[in-house]
Amino acid sequence: PEILARIKQHELAYRMQTSVPELMDLSGESDATFELYGEEARQAGSFAACCLNARRLAERGVRNIQIFHRGWDAHGNLAGEHGNQCKDIDQGSAGLIQDLRQRGMLDDTLVVWGGEFGRTPYCQGRLGKDNYGRDHHPRCFSIWMAGGGIKPGITYGRTDDYGYNIADADGNQLKPQPDKHKWTPGTMHIHDLNATILNQLGIDHRKLTYRYQGRDFRLTDVHGNVAHEIIA
């Protein structure tokens, strides 16, 4: 069985590599598609081109697709840097969602846009009018999701008035942030986010385990609740 598995692995690698030239050739895409994603989609390696390629990968059955976009770590010159970053990702992101919708793929595709932390509500650095930064802030941050059975056009969760801590529905700060041992509706711990994403992929986060150093682990540790309030 091990030899047969290795043979299949090499065969899969061959099929994947030989499919790349056709996948990356965007010459067959219509002008309307490039208008949707933006003219930068014609430029290889641009964020818009990556979004277009993400749709093409999804069409070919690729189950997990990740797009990277660097340059958000603005400890200085945040106003200029984040403004340019938003311009870079805006049309490509919107184009991807619209393209998936018009092709009937959005209901079966979950788009998650976010990072590993947010930025502090207070400034750092030179503190000039046009040149200031913000530090890392893992206590609370925002992401957005589209498709994949998630309710459109809603917001979920809130912070305190300073944007520093997670708060309950009445705006009261939660300690800890939030309590991963106690489910508080309207808030989302990172374990809850992972549990919800897995749920939309048809996976029960309580049953999915992997073995490491002789022990079974869950991606959500021993915590996590599915946020049914955001599921359509």
Residue ranges and their predicted role:
Residues 1-232:
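Ligand-binding pockets and gating/stacking loops
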